Amino acid sequence: ICDCSFFGPHCIICEINGAHGQGHRHSLTSIHRAGTPFSTIHFYEHTMQAWSEGKTLHLGAEAEVISGTWFGRPAVLKKRRPRGWRHPDLDSSLTKKRMTNEIKLTIWLARRGAPVPAIWDVDIQEAKIIMERIDGKPLIEILRNNEHDEELLINVGKAIRELHRNAVNHGDLSTNNILIDKERKPILIDLGLSSREYDLEGFGIDLHVLHEILRASHPEVKGAMDLVLKGYVALDEELGKPQPAP
């Protein structure tokens, strides 16, 4: 997944004695958004100083999400929280693995135009990711406030199918991990448990998990999963049979 030749001789994403290991980090915005040549990528020392912190948006068992700005742009900082019940070495190893997985797949999907947020900065050692802030609400909130319609749920299905067409299983497809932006476009977040493989069983598990959540947490939304599946199937009808992802 990680194109080391794109990042130069030492890649911070696969961490092969890279810039990150030397205490440096760099902006990923121009890399995965515009494909900036390596020679024009500016490396920053301690770029987390460019982060201006706001309020905490979410404090969960796995991570804390904080709003703020990054070089003046609306952003969020996601910081993985240590799990006290796990051995520190095991916890550190699992956190690093999941963060690296999330970073790799999110950047790879963003390059292909999939509905995921842009990642702007990472710090593996401190378990931090800075990414663009999506101005919107999680699907769970939209459904609870009865702010949904048929078109929205159909578009959720299309977003999920777009992920699967790129041979990525989400791994934790809950209504908390689907954001709806101001234009009513679904954005898929939190890919720490995702995997890249064109696996029909994995796709089915994603859909089954979402179905169970909709049925248990949102029983008042009648036919929700039917609409999601309608959108899921419709995307293939619009775009044709998916081609193998390179």
Give the predicted meaning of each segment.
Residues 2-4, 11-14:
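Cysteine-centered motifs
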Residues 108-112, 140-176, 181, 207, ...:
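Conserved kinase catalytic-core helix
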Residues 44-59, 72, 155, 183, ...:
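Regulatory N- and C-terminal appendages and interdomain linkers associated
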Residues 54-56, 61-99:
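ATP-binding glycine-rich loop module of kinase domains
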Residues 187, 191-246:
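C-lobe/activation-segment region of protein kinase-like
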Residues 117-153:
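Conserved structural core of kinase catalytic domains
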Residues 92-108, 112:
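The N-lobe alphaC helix and its flanking beta3-alphaC-beta4 segment of protein kinase-like domains
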